[in-house]
UniProtKB/Swiss-Prot annotation:
GTP binds at residues 19-26, 81-85, 136-139. GO terms for cellular component: apicoplast; mitochondrion. It is an enzyme of class 3 (hydrolase). InterPro entries: EF-Tu_GTPase, EFTu-like_2, EFTU_2, G_TR_CS, P-loop_NTPase, Small_GTP-bd, T_Tr_GTP-bd_dom, Transl_B-barrel_sf. GTP hydrolase that promotes the GTP-dependent binding of aminoacyl-tRNA to the A-site of ribosomes during protein biosynthesis. Residues 81-84 are annotated as: G3. Belongs to the TRAFAC class translation factor GTPase superfamily. Classic translation factor GTPase family. EF-Tu/EF-1A subfamily. This is Elongation factor Tu, apicoplast.
Amino acid sequence: MNNKLFLRNKQHINLGTIGHVDHGKTTLTTAISYLLNLQGLSKKYNYSDIDSAPEEKIRGITINTTHIEYETLTKHCAHIDCPGHSDYIKNMIIGATQMDIAILVISIIDGIMPQTYEHLLLIKQIGIKNIIIFLNKEDLCDDVELIDFIKLEVNELLIKYNFDLNYIHILTGSALNVINIIQKNKDYELIKSNIWIQKLNNLIQIIDNIIIPTRKINDYFLMSIEDVFSITGRGTVVTGKIEQGCINLNDEIEILKFEKSSPNLTTVIGLEMFKKQLTQAQSGDNVGILLRNIQKKDIKRGMILATPNKLKVYKSFIAETYILTKEEGGRHKPFNIGYKPQFFIRTVDVTGEIKNIYLNENVQKVAIPGDKITLHIELKHYIVLTLNMKFSIREGGKTIGAGIITEIKN
């Protein structure tokens, strides 16, 4: 872990780019860093810095979520660039669970595509209210009516999924044009009046002006583990976004695993955010936590770090659930009691079995796409569950439902 200290002089937020494959998410992330770099607020990240895995470079798509850091005038930003390809939607869900603001990128040339629907539904289910819709590749379209039609179509989709339009911003622009302009002229004063630069500055200004809800700093500490790795000679580091509370160096915390046994107690011996050391991390921070006497093989993504004696693990619960229709990208056919899809809860995905189906308190044999029903679900293994927690249901590479936990069974 690094020796440089993290300076907390601006509000820290987590935001990210989502959307269909090849609509320009990574290009937009690159363009934002280029423009802020000219203004002295960010390191410049090239496309290759963000799509860093060998397979990503070969295929030209983002597979894993990538985190980069930059500052605006009022905020310190952790930017998560999420994959758009349907094969890697699991990684997108993990990235989206960390966001305060989602930037949904839509190509004006292609319009709304299958992953656009799915990503919107997922961020709604995760609970992200603040959304910036960036209609990209405007330079390739001279049909004003087409742009207006796509705006209308997006608006109708947001209303359909019950988004609060007071928290939605719809912008147009060209991320690639911004990059090309800056590569040719690195004097910000000479290019700041360019229409494409102005359009991207509008997006950055919206990020600056969005008010992030008060963090749950005074609650007990809770973090869902996103990743784990070892540092030779130091120990095991777990990463993730702190959901609530604070954590300090030398604090004792517990690891809640996927089994009903006594949690592992450990001590925090290092805290880091974007390669800078912290003495304290708080709700909303994306951190790496160095743990004492813990081996990498004993930690899995989706396990929970928490203040001791605050949480328990369960595997059975009741949930109010909506089953997506075929038109929404869901199942084409009903499912029965005994159906075993995947459940995505925080950063974990786990198989679960439908034990019972209820409609208006009456037991049903089947659930039909489009139904709003109550399900009794039993997971394959134990995880930390809390009331009112939201989750997604997936099968065969697509989202088929979404729900909220209303009762936890011992």
